A protein has these predicted regions:
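Short structural boundary motif marking the start of a folded domain
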Residues: 2-8, 34
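Short beta-strand or tight-loop elements
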Residues: 3, 20-22, 69
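Terminal peptide-recognition signature
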Residues: 7, 38, 135
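Short gly/ser/thr-rich secondary-structure transition/capping motifs
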Residues: 15-21, 54-55
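Cytochrome P450 core scaffold surrounding the K-helix E-X-X-R motif
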Residues: 46-51
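NAD(P)H dinucleotide-binding glycine-rich loop of Rossmann-like/cofactor-binding domains
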Residues: 90-138
Length: 138
């Protein structure tokens, strides 16, 4: 992993809201015990609201949206995940309360992840996302 990578960062200072792709480093990622190289991230309705104006969904700025993502574990301090594990992250208020998947790398709590089934590609795993999984339950 290189020291710097790109992330879509939203920020709000007073009444001024901004969004831009920025170069950040691993230390910018605040939460979690598993570092993931993000391969795909879906566009969720909440992501669209956050990208529009923060939509009062984000409590702390700057912030990286992206409620759903899939990728490969790069580093882990969680006993359930090791380097090379292919994962999916959806829900748990990732992208709202925690930095999300609109970044080349994401750092999240291991309990937010599931191992991706081998018969499902990273891209396929993002087709449904949180919204699709919610609809299935209705």
């Amino acid at each position: 992993m290189s020291d710097n990578f790109k992330a879509l960062v939203v920020n709000q200072e007073g009444d001024k809201f901004s969004r831009e792709v920025k170069s950040v480093n691993k230390e910018f990622l605040k939460h979690g015990d598993v570092l993931v190289k993000v391969e795909y991230s879906g566009l969720n309705y909440k992501d669209a609201l956050i990208l529009k104006n923060g939509a009062k969904l984000v409590k702390e700025f700057p912030h990286i949206p992206g409620i759903d993502f899939s990728g490969t574990v790069v580093e882990s301090k969680n006993e359930n995940y090791k380097q090379g594990d292919e994962i999916i992250c959806t829900g748990w208020r990732v992208g709202e309360l925690y930095y999300g998947g609109y970044s080349q790398y994401a750092k999240v709590k291991g309990e937010f992840l599931v191992k991706r089934p081998k018969n499902l590609s990273a891209k396929q795993s993002m087709i449904l996302g949180t919204a699709g999984l919610t609809a299935i339950q209705c």
